[in-house]
């Protein structure tokens, strides 16, 4: 039941699109919603940053680095979002907000490093670079997509983002996806796949999309610091 990174990406992106599409077409109020042509460029960019690049860089990076290195690099996410939001959306960087994010970063790093000794092995450099691109891509996504999330329905946004994201990851993942032997999957493997698609992808993206409609990008990113607490 072992799956390669690109196989997981193929299944989770396609599965999430199917769920979002199914919900939208089954509800009349959502079925009639459209995205304005002027928003197409931002939609495409958001899809590439938040789905395609984010997913491929993260899983590829984990194959070449340690979870500790990945967690440390990801802890920079709220800081990058704060910078991008100030630059692109002209959000004000207040002293209290900056201080809170830096304090959260320090706390997250303490939890990560206390539970796992830091290893600065040269062999992790390639993987670390992938994770850096992943973190920068996700941070930029939270800022670039914000105007769309405020304007449109979350389910409709997810439908289109994951459709575009699937088109983008398809050339890189289809070869491995065709090699998946579904007949070898036991019940635990099927449960794991469904959990990845529904729990850690569809629900996670839905709540983030919903939150961006009501909160600033930097506040949404700030909740990244809850992850080390939950893991610990």
Task: Identify what each model region corresponds to.
Residues 2, 16-36, 106-121, 164-189, ...:
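Membrane-interface helix-cap regions at the ends of transmembrane helices
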Residues 19, 23-24, 28, 78-102, ...:
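C-terminal transmembrane-helix exit sites in multi-pass transporters
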Residues 38, 74, 90-110, 124-125, ...:
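Loop-to-transmembrane alpha-helix entry segments
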Residues 21, 47-52, 56, 78-83, ...:
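Hydrophobic/small/kink-forming positions within alpha-helical transmembrane segments
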Residues 5-6, 17-20, 81-83, 119-177, ...:
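Transmembrane alpha-helical segments that form core, pore/gating elements
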Residues 20, 44, 84, 93-115, ...:
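Hydrophobic transmembrane alpha-helices of multi-pass small-molecule transport proteins
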Residues 25-69, 73-74, 110, 197-215:
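Specific transmembrane alpha-helical segments of multi-pass solute transporters/efflux pumps
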Residues 1-3, 8-11, 15, 56-65, ...:
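Juxtamembrane C-cap of transmembrane helices in multi-pass membrane transport proteins
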